[in-house]
Amino acid sequence: MSSINGLVSEPFLAVYSASKGAVVMLTRGIALDYAKTGIRCNAICPGWVDTPINYAHAELLGGLQKVYEGISVFQPIGRPGEPREIAHLVLFLASDEASFITGSIISADGGMSAM
């Protein structure tokens, strides 16, 4: 699991972004190393998802209510993601239906990376 911050930068998140960017490159390397063995490796890069880890981040940004009111500025879908939405993507990628997907970096970010 990476993060949209592994693909785009935000103020005050340099170290976090660097670590998530490393996950992106590790994913690609593992995919290349193990593709011929049938092992697949993909990374999901969620945007803002309504989880407790983001509540602390929201406090730094002026509070959860303020963040949610302004979320459409950086997430075009206009709302935070829900954990179940990310879980469904994980389940799909782990399924045989995704057997041709490896080395992919998949943004689940409400359109944030399209901006």
Where are the predicted features?
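A glycine/serine/threonine-rich, flexible loop-to-helix segment
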Residues: 48-74
